[in-house]
A protein has these predicted regions:
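Low-complexity, S/T/G/P-rich flexible repeat/linker segments used as non-globular hinges
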Residues: 2, 112-138
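Compositionally biased, intrinsically disordered low-complexity regions
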Residues: 13-19, 94, 102, 118, ...
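Short amphipathic secondary-structure patches
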Residues: 55-110
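Residue-level preference for non-acidic, small/hydrophobic
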Residues: 51, 104, 129-131
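Alpha-helical assembly-interface signal, strongest on the long, hydrophobic N-terminal helix that forms
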Residues: 2-73
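Low-complexity, flexible helical/coil segments
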Residues: 11-13, 88, 129-130, 138
Length: 138
């Protein structure tokens, strides 16, 4: 009777150990997912600030000399200063010559632990932000 009782407890100990391992794996996966999501969100918010600053710089440059090319160059310079890993998107600098309002679109890949390495989640790491601003009034 004692041996049967010990075997029963051995089987339960294995099941409990397996449940602990499964729960630890689930907790780790949830933690990594939360960190990746936070990184993507932070990158999106930061990129919006970069785009806003660049659009303001470009609008001010356009007000100083109404040249679309120099305004877009000012935007690129602002982006480089604010975040060297962010890039101005193709056709990401649009200047309304009538109003002096500039729309800037900036792209960047968020740094993640897992999302950037998996093909079905990689597109979530490619972040873009578009901001529109006019020249500052002094």
């Amino acid at each position: 009777m004692n041996r049967t009782h010990d075997r029963l407890h051995d089987g339960q100990a294995g099941a409990v150990g397996m449940m602990i391992i499964i729960w630890l794996v689930v907790v780790v996966l949830l933690g990594v997912t939360a960190i990746d999501a936070g990184s993507i969100a932070f990158t999106k918010f930061r990129l919006a600030d970069v785009a806003s600053s660049a659009s303001t710089q470009a609008a001010n440059a356009f007000r100083s000399s109404p040249n679309v090319s120099s305004a877009c160059q000012a935007a690129e310079a602002s982006i480089l200063v604010d975040d060297s890993s962010a890039k101005l998107a193709k056709k990401g600098c649009v200047v309304d010559a009538q109003t002096g309002v500039v729309t800037i679109t900036v792209r960047k890949e968020a740094t993640t632990i897992i999302a950037g390495r998996l093909s079905f989640t990689k597109h979530f790491t490619k972040v873009s932000a578009t901001e529109t601003n006019g020249p500052t009034s002094l």
